Amino acid sequence: MQYRVDSKSGNRISALGLGCMRFPGAPGHPDAKTADAIISRAVEQGINYLDTAYLYPGNEVCVGASLERLGLRDRVLLATKLPHASCVCTGDFDRFFDEQLRRLRTDRIDYYLMHNITSPAQWERVVALGIEDWIARQKAAGRIRQIGFSYHGSAADFLDGA
C-alpha cells in the first residue's frame, strides 16, 4: 500500500481509503458478517482510512460494531460527516456528533467532514450557527482530530467562494 502524510497532523494515510457507504445487506441494515470481512481484509491490505457518514442508514452503527469486534479502532483513521443541512441551531452540532460517537463506539473522530456542501452559502449558514467555535472546542477536547468537507457543487461556485 502506498501512503501519504497529512502535513497538518502527521498522520500516515493509505492512498486508498475504504468508503463504507454501501456494505451489502438490506437498506439501512448492513450485513455485519460481510462488513467485518470487508473491513478486516482492507486493514490487512494496508488500508487505514475508513469513511462513513451520519446520513448512510445503519452504516455508522455497523462500522463502529465491526471495529469493536475486530479490535481495529486504534489501527484506522476514522472519518465521518456532519449532516449540516439538518442543523438549525448550534445545539444540533452536539446532538449529531454525540450520536455519531455512540454509533461508532469511539471517543474521537479522526477526520470530521461537513457533508455534501453544494455552495458557499451553505458553508456561510453553518458558520453563522457557530460551527467554527464548536469545532475549535471539540478539537481542544480531543474529540475531533482533523476537519474537512465534501463538496458537491460546481467548480465555478467553489472557486468563487474560496
Which residues does each predicted region cover?
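N-terminal binding-site loop/beta-alpha segment at the start of enzyme catalytic domains
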Residues: 1-76, 140
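Structural preference for beta-strand elements that scaffold enzyme active sites
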Residues: 13-17, 48-49, 75-81, 108-113, ...
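Hydrophobic pocket-lining residues within nucleotide cofactor-binding pockets
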Residues: 23, 82, 117
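Glycine/proline-rich, positively charged
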Residues: 26-27, 40, 44, 87-162
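Active-site-proximal beta-strand/loop segments in catalytic clefts of secreted hydrolases
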Residues: 53, 81-83, 150-152
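Generic structural signal for short, solvent-exposed loop/turn connectors between secondary structure elements
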Residues: 55-62, 82-94
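Hydrophobic positions in alpha-helices of CheY-like receiver
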Residues: 67, 82, 135-138
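Short alpha-helix boundary/capping motifs
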Residues: 70-71, 79, 128-129
